[in-house]
């Protein structure tokens, strides 16, 4: 179920504040965040945000196509290592 149309998209206040300060000063630093549920705003385009995947921070460069999506959509939380083949069944 999607968010109510009466409400604005969610973005962590501290994250948005850091982005707006960097836009005002012209800096392009990597910002660490644990807020995977924050929506990407147009002000964030061109910045790199390190999103936490549960183990480490993964840097994500934000482009125009990502606006409206959540930060967590671009960082995987699970690692797929493949299925382990059974060695005894291969001998037959």
From Swiss-Prot:
It comes from the Bacteria. GO terms for molecular function: rRNA binding; structural constituent of ribosome. Keywords: Ribonucleoprotein, Ribosomal protein, RNA-binding, rRNA-binding. GO terms for cellular component: cytoplasm; small ribosomal subunit. Transmembrane segments: none annotated. PROSITE patterns: RIBOSOMAL_S19. One of its GO terms (biological process) is translation. Disulfide bonds: none annotated. Protein S19 forms a complex with S13 that binds strongly to the 16S ribosomal RNA. Belongs to the universal ribosomal protein uS19 family. This is Small ribosomal subunit protein uS19. It comes from Clostridium botulinum (strain Eklund 17B / Type B). The gene is rpsS.
């Amino acid at each position: 179920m999607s968010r109510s149309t009466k409400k604005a998209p969610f973005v962590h206040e501290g994250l948005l504040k850091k982005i707006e300060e960097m836009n005002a000063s012209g800096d392009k630093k990597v910002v660490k965040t644990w807020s995977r549920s924050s929506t990407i705003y147009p002000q964030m385009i061109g910045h790199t945000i390190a999103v936490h995947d549960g183990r480490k921070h993964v840097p994500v460069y934000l482009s125009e196509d990502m606006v409206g999506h959540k930060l967590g959509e671009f960082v995987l939380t699970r690692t797929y290592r493949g299925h382990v083949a059974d060695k005894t069944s291969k001998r037959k």
